[in-house]
Amino acid sequence: MSCSRSDAEHYISAGWVRVDGRVELVAESRVGDSQKVELDAHATLKPAAPVTILLRQPTAHAGDAAADASDGDPAMEYLKSAARASDDRSGIRVLKSHFTHLKSVAPLEKGASGLVVFTQDGRIARKLTQDAGGIEREVIVEVEGEIAEHGLKRLNHGLEWNGKALPPIKASWQNERRLRFALKGERPGQIVHMCASVGLKVLGMKRIRIGRVPMAGLAPGQWRYLPNGGKF
């Protein structure tokens, strides 16, 4: 078949073209006379649907390129070298265009690890930014020290921050060194402040869920797509 240069570039960037059986994503690649070029039978000129990527961000350490990211978001640096989870069941084909125009919409506190979100979808971006106060986030917090009397009850309901009462949350012991927090409208520094208010020092934080979306199945440094129609 014949097509314009712009159409050909679209087919290639969308992953519809194979050279010797392998998907070719670089339009400028040279193809030899003996090589077999195939266009997928389902190829379309429709723009690729926007995607959302879920990354398990490792804990940043001094000296990491991500820890020193100039844009202040280490997750973006981790994503550049991260690997797609082998059990990603979204059915979405990886395209080069999926890694452009991504917006980080659920960054972690400095030094924390766990689930972060990148999206090209404006609806999801608004959900996780403008409407973030209504979405519950679950965080595992490693602590040391002896909790104050009635400390767990106070964590759940009874603390103040900057002179204002904090809304009720769900806090429980996972084991003798780890607390599980489930809270909405989390603000930077809030968990550290809450723990300090009841005599505990935070050693580490790991976010394991945002709304309905869990981190389960992702190893540190791995990512997967949010399935089409997936919701937070």
Where are these regions (language model features)?
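Basic, flexible Lys/Arg- and Gly-enriched helix-loop patches that mediate nucleic-acid binding at interfaces
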Residues: 1-232
